């Protein structure tokens, strides 16, 4: 009897140890809700970070990703999509989530560079040989030019596009709000398709063959040329463009509920590491790290950049004036 009890106890202990071991090795899942054209970036980054995390902690990590227009993605998180982290196109979309109590109000100061680990800008992708002779923003407003750009109501990239054109007009000799409005009105008069996100617009231009010019994230333009060949497209960098600063944040309410704060924070912090910066640069994002940026300097065209704070007084003011219901974008589209 004693022998049987001992055997049973040994068996129970063995099962307990096995279960404990299984629990220690069980996968942790986190969800990164991101904007449209970061699919390739985060596919590579997620694999590298998961390997790093496994070596550091012994914990297996399963990183899931959701992509779409930045404004649309922010609304999905507000409406209940349980993102552990968000990596969105602009600070305003993260602020919108924070205003609902899901992210701490001071999120922008929790990571370096205002929680924007890489930057980009806005350029033009044109058909090979540039048949419409597109050189700068003013050319986009000329008759006979068909433009593809996403919808600022749903896409973060589209908002950067709109403000880049507006800022260009303001910075011309004699530039003012009226002249900016005239140029941007003429540009949107030429828009053939307003997709919901930047990747959708790339598909419309590249795969469906619509339009003469795609107003695009710089990284998206370079990716298109890389994947489809320099014999099909040219990249035109305007004389002036906007410094686009995609923002990242831990979704506090979700990570505290799921117990994933430590890994989610590390996931975003690793974007600033030399390895994270290298991955960003390989995917045509402009890295913050000066050493990595120097290695990739020849990859990017020289362009004069202005910031949203310098020209528009920040995202809150810009969103209200240009993209809120009844704002300047709505007024321009209504007259199209």
Q: Which sequence ranges carry the predicted segments?
A:
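Bacterial N-terminal signal peptides that target proteins for export
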Residues: 1-12
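Bacterial N-terminal signal peptides
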Residues: 10-20
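N-terminal segment of the mature folded domain
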Residues: 27-155, 297, 332-333
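Short beta-strand->loop
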Residues: 33-35, 126-128, 146-173, 187-191, ...
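A bilobed periplasmic-binding-protein/Venus flytrap-type ligand-binding module shared by bacterial periplasmic
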Residues: 122-130, 245-262, 279-283
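Short helix-loop capping/hinge motifs at secondary-structure junctions, enriched
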Residues: 129-135, 154, 167-175, 254-261
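Ligand-binding pocket segment of bilobal, Venus flytrap-like solute-binding proteins
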Residues: 172-239
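Extracellular/periplasmic juxtamembrane helices and adjacent flexible linkers that interface
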Residues: 255-336
């Amino acid at each position: 009897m004693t022998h049987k009890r001992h055997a049973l106890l040994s068996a129970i202990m063995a099962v307990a140890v096995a279960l404990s071991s299984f629990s220690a090795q069980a996968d942790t899942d986190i969800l990164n809700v991101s904007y449209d054209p970061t699919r390739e970036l985060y596919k590579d980054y997620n694999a590298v970070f998961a390997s790093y995390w496994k070596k550091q902690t012994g914990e297996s990590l399963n990183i899931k990703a959701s992509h779409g227009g930045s404004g649309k993605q922010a609304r999905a998180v507000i409406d209940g999509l349980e993102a552990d982290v968000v990596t969105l196109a602009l600070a305003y979309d993260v602020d919108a989530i924070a205003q609902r109590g899901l992210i701490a109000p001071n999120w922008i100061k929790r990571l370096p560079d205002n929680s924007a680990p890489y930057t980009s800008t806005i350029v033009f992708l044109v058909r090979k040989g540039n048949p419409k002779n597109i050189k700068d923003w003013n050319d986009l407003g000329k008759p006979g030019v068909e433009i593809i750009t996403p919808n600022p109501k749903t896409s973060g990239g589209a908002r950067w596009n709109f403000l880049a054109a507006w800022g260009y007009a303001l910075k011309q000799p004699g530039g003012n709000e009226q002249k900016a409005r005239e140029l941007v009105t003429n540009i949107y008069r030429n828009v053939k398709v307003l997709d919901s996100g930047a990747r959708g617009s790339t598909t419309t231009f590249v795969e469906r063959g619509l339009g003469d010019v795609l107003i695009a994230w710089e990284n998206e333009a370079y990716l298109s040329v890389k994947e489809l060949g320099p014999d099909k497209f040219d990249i035109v960098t305007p004389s002036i463009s906007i410094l686009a600063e995609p923002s990242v944040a831990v979704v506090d309410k979700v990570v505290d509920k799921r117990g994933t704060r430590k890994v989610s924070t590390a996931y975003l912090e690793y974007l600033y590491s030399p390895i994270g910066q290298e991955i960003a640069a390989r995917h045509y994002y402009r890295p913050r790290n000066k050493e990595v940026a120097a290695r990739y300097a020849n990859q990017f065209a020289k362009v004069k950049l202005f910031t949203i704070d310098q020209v528009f007084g920040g995202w809150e003011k810009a969103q209200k004036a240009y993209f809120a219901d009844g704002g300047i974008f709505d007024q321009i589209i209504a007259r199209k």
